[in-house]
């Protein structure tokens, strides 16, 4: 059983599948009817008008209707689109057990505990027939799918078949009086339109269910005698064919499968049983622990069943329907109807190759699961779940195509899965021993390869390689070297899809798609809410995949979307352009044409193929909010502008892309204060003073406008702003403008008019306006304020700008491929916006005299209409522009955009020094000094296998800052960076640049080494370790000049590595308080490190003392002997001789994992010896050795590189590149 959907609810008594939609109705014992989408797993609606349990429910085949019958004796017809009950049919006198629509006529058949079956016309809402004859509860009744028959089951131990042919002949509406008479006769006597054709007796207890076969003259029934009986009928009689026994309690429901020759039954014994209808034997049994089953329903078209039980329902399939297939070149090989077939994509021709052996067992799920094809040998491997997992090998002759009589005896074998790994070799997974068996085409074992971890399945991963699936990961396994080449965390992978060039792989699990490259380096992961079914790579590197109800795409960067909605699931085999080839669940090849323009457009953007993008914009019908938002998210608002008609959206996109002309045009159309305000901010950012002025005028933001005039030097316009503020009675604005102008007389006048006579007097007296001050003093009388004494007087006036500045100069940039020319309309609009802006700024916004007069008259001085009127009148006034006397030939044409005449053409910039430094350099230190940290990291990763860059971050920053100096210029100018070059000379050519001067040198490393030696001698081990690691982290970034120095750098790495390993072991030893043996081992391993002689003497003395205390005399004697060989001082030598004398001839009290006779190195992670001849892996940078299990982890010595990573080696000098 393959469970597709499950619900938890009250007891389910009735079920019905929708014939086309993925919906199912469930009627509950609580009186509620639920409508579920079993594909999405969501509850769509609930209907709860019945009073008491609802036992019967059924969808109409074509109309948006369903019918329900309950214990309230009512039959209700519902419209699920309007979510309401249309009408209720009354007539039954007891519980209603089942209801069903006729597949063709407007009839409903219902069975009831009142011992009758009724047929209703739901269009006229009347009962057209009452079938009487049962003498106990009628448990079910249903129409025959094709003939005019009804079958019913009753607790009177009989199954009855009713002939309703006469009723069908009367379907033409009779006259009203005849209809009324017929209705009365039907209610009283049951009518004669339906008569009993057969009475089937044979059950010993009450019959709970009976149903017709979809096509054959068969009936199946289930009863309280725990038996399922099969009946056959013809035109004259019906008889019992066989009895199926096996249920341990009452059989609740039984029916024929819609597509397979099987019978499905469920029972109160908590089981569902599947029977072979031809052999009449049990095939399979599914049990639940606590839930009795009550009802079954079969989908009329699909291979789906549903069963209702005490605590809900389940929707399930009996067998997998995914066809086994394998794509090879222009052909897909697949299995259908027990035949191996192939389909050519180019000709769309299907050919039958050879029959496939049928499995001997009769159980379910025996169909092929996977198929692998070898094109050179024309061999096919078919795997299935038969006998717990087995494979069959077929060698198909070239001339067997189309022959149905050809039957070859397949070579068989047991195995979880099998795939071809070479031309004439295939691999079989043996799960019991967790090994891969490589076999030849004679099915003989050639090689056995044990797998490093337990695997569930294997897939092809290139010649000689296998992709092995474990529970939570996938790995690529090399069969020859028996090595894992790559690993990726991907739980519960079900299917694997390689791209045609074997460069990319998609791993499909139940609800996720993981994309990786051929080395299993993760690229992206997509999560789906419903099941992922299949997928294929198209020729552009886009992964096309299907879920239960969609065809979707996944771009290389992880962006995804929907291409098409599906009615039924399909399995993609190939995607070419707009064509998707697939197999359906019946094994039929289908071609689906889709619109690939959306993901091709996004892919072109991703790969920066802007010529392709522009062509698609011109020629295709790409539109919609999804494309616009995608372009905006990916940083292409200028492209999105060409799709947008809505002015507000155009305005936002124009601001985002910096297109001020389109923003002005849209702002005029919208004419909203907020939009003008935002336009002003963007124009100010771009330094477009004219647009800022216009935006401030449209929003009547006079304070900002006056300040703009002040900082741009238009002091005459500030004067006009002062006048306008006065006319608006804005005293604060008027006073601010007077301050800007430095007009003391005006300030005194404003303060006097405002009634602030003391302030007016102080202002006049301070600025030497004696006449006005005397007049004000007379008015103030005795209230004259005192002026401060002893201060030097100065004129409070803003600095006078030397020239009035216009728009900021704009650099000419290369015209973007998306700018202009995409369509004639867009180009014309841009030019029109430019002209409109120029006209407005020429007259309306500069004509401040007219504006002030208009405001004095109570009008709006900044209306666009006013400006346009002035323009039409041909007035040149405003800001005295008409006073300029220009020669006739120098006059600017009226339609020329004034912005174009003031564009500053900057000199072409040269190549940045940082680019020169990195252009031909492969030295990571120089790239870091230039600020190209990403390329520096890539170089270190490639050369030394470095993965952890966190320790290098401060060194990168020091290098970059140390190779640059910064020069301050004017207060308004930016700081100028100056590159610091190595060996710079004043006479050198400006076009010749030397390498950067680096702050880290080899001589510094030697000084640091001496300091680390000193800390080691003094026993400051944490400090010494920090200094040694600092050296190890800095070495990849230094640059030396000669080959001799390169050798010295490599020697320094070895020295530091030995000390870091020894110090780490010593610190580890000091942490271990209780494990005395481990302390001795670590001390012994420390003596194996290559140290300076002074340090070696200290290490040997420490190890000797520790072993002597623990009575390991033989080992202590060995250390004493080594100490005497290293020229100890007098006290050390005396102590060593004493130990040697005391330990002579004695043995160790405990065994240590230390054999000084056998040469070894110490693992840098586990601190265990790796003796000569044992396998090990090393760090590509520092050369530390590790046990093989550490491969792929971060080196614990240098803390930078990955153990076992591929690396080209240290590059620290230009001489290595010559």
Curated annotation (Swiss-Prot):
Pfam families: B-prop_COPA_B_2nd, COPI_C, TPR_COPA_B, WD40. It is found in: Cytoplasm; Golgi apparatus membrane; Cytoplasmic vesicle, COPI-coated vesicle membrane. This is Coatomer subunit alpha-3. Oligomeric complex that consists of at least the alpha, beta, beta', gamma, delta, epsilon and zeta subunits. It comes from the Eukaryota. Keywords: Cytoplasm, Cytoplasmic vesicle, ER-Golgi transport, Golgi apparatus, Membrane, Protein transport, Repeat, Transport, WD repeat. Residues 862-888 have a biased composition (Acidic residues). Signal peptide: none annotated. One of its GO terms (biological process) is endoplasmic reticulum to Golgi vesicle-mediated transport. It is a peripheral membrane protein. Residues 854-893 are annotated as: Disordered.
């Amino acid at each position: 059983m393959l469970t597709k959907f499950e619900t938890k609810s009250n007891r389910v008594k009735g079920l019905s599948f929708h014939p086309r939609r993925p919906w199912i109705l469930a009627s509950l014992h609580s009186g509620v009817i639920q409508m579920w989408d079993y594909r999405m797993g969501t509850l769509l609606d609930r209907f709860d008008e019945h009073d008491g349990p609802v036992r019967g429910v059924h969808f109409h085949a074509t109309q948006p209707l369903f019918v329900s019958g309950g214990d309230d004796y009512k039959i209700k017809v519902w419209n699920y689109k309007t979510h309401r009950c249309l009408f209720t049919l009354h007539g039954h006198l007891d519980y209603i057990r089942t209801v069903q629509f006729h597949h063709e006529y407007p009839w409903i058949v219902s069975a009831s505990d009142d011992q009758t079956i009724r047929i209703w016309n739901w269009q006229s809402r009347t009962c057209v027939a009452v079938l009487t004859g049962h003498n106990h509860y009628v448990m079910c009744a249903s129409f025959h799918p094709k003939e005019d028959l009804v079958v019913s089951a009753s607790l009177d131990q009989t199954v009855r078949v009713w002939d309703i042919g006469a009723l069908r002949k009367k379907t033409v509406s009779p006259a009203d009086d005849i209809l009324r008479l017929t209705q009365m006769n039907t209610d009283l006597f049951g009518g004669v339109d339906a008569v009993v054709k057969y009475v089937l007796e044979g059950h010993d207890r009450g019959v709970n269910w009976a149903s017709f076969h979809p096509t054959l003259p068969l009936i199946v029934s289930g009863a309280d005698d725990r038996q399922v009986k099969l009946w056959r009928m013809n035109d004259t009689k019906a008889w019992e064919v066989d009895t199926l026994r096996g249920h341990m309690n009452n059989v609740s429901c039984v029916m024929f499968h819609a597509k397979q020759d099987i019978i499905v039954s469920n029972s109160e014994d908590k089981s569902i049983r599947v029977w072979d209808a031809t052999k009449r034997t049990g095939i399979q049994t599914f049990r639940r622990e606590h839930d009795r089953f009550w009802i079954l329903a079969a989908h009329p078209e699909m291979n789906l069943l549903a069963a209702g039980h005490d605590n809900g329902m389940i929707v399930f399939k009996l067998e997998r329907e995914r066809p086994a297939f394998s794509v090879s070149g222009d052909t897909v090989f697949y299995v259908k109807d027990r035949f191996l077939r192939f389909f050519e994509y180019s000709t769309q021709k299907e050919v039958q190759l050879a029959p496939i052996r049928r499995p001997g067992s009769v159980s379910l799920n025996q169909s092929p699961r996977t198929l692998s094809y070898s094109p050179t040998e024309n061999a096919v491997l078919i795997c299935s779940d038969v006998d717990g997992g087995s494979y069959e090998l077929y060698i198909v002759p070239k001339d067997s195509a189309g022959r149905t009589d050809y039957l070859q005896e397949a070579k068989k074998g047991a195995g979880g899965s099998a795939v071809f790994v070479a031309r004439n070799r295939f691999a079989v997974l043996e799960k019991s021993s967790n090994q891969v068996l490589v076999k030849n085409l004679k099915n003989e074992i050639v090689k056995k390869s044990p797998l490093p971890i337990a695997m569930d399945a294997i897939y092809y991963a290139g010649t000689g390689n296998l992709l092995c699936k474990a529970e939570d990961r996938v790995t690529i396994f090399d069969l020859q070297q028996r090595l894992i080449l790559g690993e990726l965390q991907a739980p519960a992978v079900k299917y694997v899809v390689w791209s045609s060039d074997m460069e990319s792989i998609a791993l499909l699990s139940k609800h996720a798609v993981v994309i990786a490259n051929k080395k299993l380096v993760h690229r992206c992961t997509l999560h789906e809410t419903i099941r992922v079914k299949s997928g294929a790579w198209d020729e552009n590197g886009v992964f096309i995949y299907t879920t239960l109800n969609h065809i979707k795409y996944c771009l290389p960067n992880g962006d995804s979307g929907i291409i098409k909605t599906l009615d039924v699931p399909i399995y993609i085999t190939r995607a070419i352009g707009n064509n998707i080839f697939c197999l359906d669940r019946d094994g039929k090849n289908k071609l689906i044409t889709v619109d690939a323009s959306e993901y091709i457009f996004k892919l072109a953007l991703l790969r920066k193929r802007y010529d392709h993008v522009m062509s698609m914009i011109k020629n295709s019908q790409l539109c919609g909010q999804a494309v616009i938002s995608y372009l905006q998210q990916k940083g292409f608002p200028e492209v999105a502008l060409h799709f947008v008609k809505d002015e507000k959206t155009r305005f936002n996109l124009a601001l985002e892309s910096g297109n001020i002309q389109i923003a002005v045009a849209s702002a005029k159309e919208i004419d909203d204060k907020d939009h003008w305000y935002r336009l002003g901010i963007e124009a100010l950012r771009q330094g477009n003073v004219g647009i800022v002025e216009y935006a401030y005028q449209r929003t009547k933001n006079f304070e900002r406008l006056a300040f703009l005039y002040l900082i741009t030097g238009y002091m005459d316009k500030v004067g006009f702003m002062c006048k306008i503020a006065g006319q608006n009675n804005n005293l604060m604005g008027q006073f601010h403008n007077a301050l800007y102008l430095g007009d003391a007389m005006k300030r005194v006048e404003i303060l006097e008019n405002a009634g602030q006579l003391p302030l007016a007097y102080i202002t006049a007296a301070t600025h030497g306006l004696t006449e006005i001050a005397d007049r004000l003093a007379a008015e103030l009388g005795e209230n004259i304020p005192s002026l401060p004494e002893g201060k030097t007087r100065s004129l409070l006036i803003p600095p006078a700008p030397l020239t009035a500045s216009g728009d900021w100069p704009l650099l000419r940039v290369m015209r973007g491929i998306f700018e202009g020319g995409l369509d004639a309309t867009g180009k014309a609009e841009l030019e029109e916006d430019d002209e409109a802006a120029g006209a407005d700024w020429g007259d309306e916004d500069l004509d401040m005299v007219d504006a002030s007069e208009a405001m004095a008259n109570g009008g709006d001085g900044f209306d666009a209409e006013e400006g346009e009127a002035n323009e039409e009148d041909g007035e040149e006034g405003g800001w005295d522009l008409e006073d300029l006397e220009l020669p006739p030939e120098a006059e600017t044409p009226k339609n020329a955009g004034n912005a174009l005449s003031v564009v500053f053409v900057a000199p072409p910039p040269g190549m940045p020094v940082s680019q020169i430094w990195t252009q031909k350099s492969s030295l990571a230190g120089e790239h870091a000094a230039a600020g190209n940290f990403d390329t520096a990291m890539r170089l270190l990763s490639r050369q030394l296998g470095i993965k952890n860059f966190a320790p290098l971050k401060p060194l990168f920053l020091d290098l970059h800052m140390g190779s640059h100096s910064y020069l301050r210029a004017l207060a308004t100018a930016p700081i100028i960076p100056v590159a610091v070059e190595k060996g710079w000379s004043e006479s050198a050519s400006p076009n010749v640049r030397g390498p950067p001067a680096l702050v880290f040198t080899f001589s510094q490393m030697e000084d640091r080494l001496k300091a680390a030696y000193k800390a080691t001698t003094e026993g400051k081990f944490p400090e010494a370790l920090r200094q040694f690691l600092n050296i190890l982290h800095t070495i990849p970034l230094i640059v030396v000049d000669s080959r001799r120095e390169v050798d010295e750098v490599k020697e320094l790495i070895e020295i530091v590595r030995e000390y870091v390993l020894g110090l780490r072991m010593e610190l580890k030893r000091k942490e271990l308080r209780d494990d005395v043996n481990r302390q001795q081992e670590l001390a012994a391993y420390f003596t194996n490190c290559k140290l300076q002689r002074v340090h070696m003497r200290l290490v040997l003395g420490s190890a000797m003392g520790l072993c002597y205390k623990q009575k390991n005399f033989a080992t202590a004697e060995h250390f004493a002997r080594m100490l005497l060989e290293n020229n100890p001082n007098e006290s050390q030598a005396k102590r060593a001789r004493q130990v040697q004398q005391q330990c002579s001839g004695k043995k160790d009290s405990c065994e240590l994992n230390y054999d000084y006779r056998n040469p070894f190195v110490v693992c840098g992670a586990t601190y265990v010896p790796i003796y000569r001849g044992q396998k090990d892996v090393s760090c590509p940078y520092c050369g530390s050795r590790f046990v093989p299990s550490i491969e792929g982890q971060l080196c614990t010595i240098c803390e930078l590189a990955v153990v076992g990573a591929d690396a080209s080696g240290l590059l620290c000098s230009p001489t290595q590149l010559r």
